[in-house]
């Protein structure tokens, strides 16, 4: 099979300027910091659970019984764990609602302002939730719930904005590998959050929240002063003009002069007034775009599984194998390593095939087997890390593809070429649908684990992964059929 022209000529890197590199790094690390603050919460669940239970259940507390018992939130660690699962669900529901709103807002306001505001405001909320309440010894369930709802809404500004900015700077050529590598930002953020939390956890869980919130706030300031949301801001041509030029350069000029007028606008420089006339599409129009609904439903199932590992993996390792919380935090990094490798490699393969769905289908089928294998992992850290990496490769990889490269494809398809302000809205729909599924899943995970045990949690993951394949099965069949026809045409030409 012939490789795409961008790989044949080695022209992918030659398209990029230092502005592309800066945008790549700024958006990468901005979302990494947002994810690091989320990961902190999952990494300190055991410590929080101990702090919220009375001393009769918590022998590590040094305070007098009378003082501690007057401040505890829950009568047992099981009740505290269930509330932590509820907080995950609350966060994800508010995050999902916020994604739908943030996508629409991002297509209508300056993406840099929206992203910077979300990062700085979220950092303040995380600081109050984890550090300030502990320093003041003020424990209140309703306050925690309200803070986590607000945090979910503020964090939701991140993903639609960074994907839209990346979509403004990087065209369809090589998008799978570029976005596959870039989508590792979430996994890098998980690793960063795990490392930061484990490094200061010995001083108290509140310091884990303090460190990540401080770094995230500083990142928001950098974004406000340093991010360019589109090439047009510095007088460069947009990616639509580059893609049109690329397509035109491969068309045979057989019609003589009558094509010149048709193609001439592709080489002209648009003034500011023409750029300003582009309007954002409506939410309903974005939902009706081909592929948006199937991928949204599929991502609802897949993000449920991926985020269950994100929220519960350190707790599972500590609870199921009896490993120390700091050790479990560090070991959970291997799931994200697998996701980084999987997203990049699968994105590259999808670029070579010029199709996304068949690559997703194969990876998800193998994900079912990896879940079965990991559910039977022995109490050995090396074997567990290996199986965890494989599981992250086949689950985290497809999740990264859908949320980044595929969302960018959907937001820049031919039907909306004259309405380029759709990328943030489409990304918000896909990721918002995924977050709704993930929100429901986090409560179900805690409930299933409490009633039936961890093995049934893995059965639930297998079911959701299978549903992901079912929802995109029409796209899989269509794209495989297209590959077969293309292969047959290639054979006939030879």
UniProtKB/Swiss-Prot annotation:
Keywords in alphabetical order: Endoplasmic reticulum, Glycoprotein, Lysosome, Membrane, Sugar transport, Transmembrane, Transmembrane helix, Transport
PROSITE patterns from the UniProt entry: MFS
Which GO CC annotations does the UniProt entry carry?
A: endoplasmic reticulum membrane; lysosomal membrane
InterPro entries, per database record? MFS, MFS_dom, MFS_trans_sf, Sugar_P_transporter
Q: Which Gene3D superfamilies match?
A: MFS general substrate transporter like domains
The record describes its post-translational modification as:
Glycosylated.
Q: Which residues cross the membrane?
A: 16-36, 81-101, 113-133, 147-167, 177-197, 209-229, 297-317, 333-353, 357-377, 386-406, 428-448, 452-472
The GO annotation for biological process reads: xenobiotic transmembrane transport
The UniProt entry lists the main location of this chain as: endoplasmic reticulum
Provide the family line. Belongs to the major facilitator superfamily. Organophosphate:Pi antiporter (OPA) (TC 2.A.1.4) family.
Which PANTHER family does this one have? MAJOR FACILITATOR SUPERFAMILY TRANSPORTER 16, ISOFORM B, SUGAR PHOSPHATE EXCHANGER 3
Q: Its function?
A: Unlike the other SLC37 members, lacks glucose-6-phosphate antiporter activity. In osteoclasts, forms a transporter complex with ATRAID for nitrogen-containing-bisphophonates (N-BPs) required for releasing N-BP molecules that have trafficked to lysosomes through fluid-phase endocytosis into the cytosol.
Q: What is this protein called?
A: Sugar phosphate exchanger 3
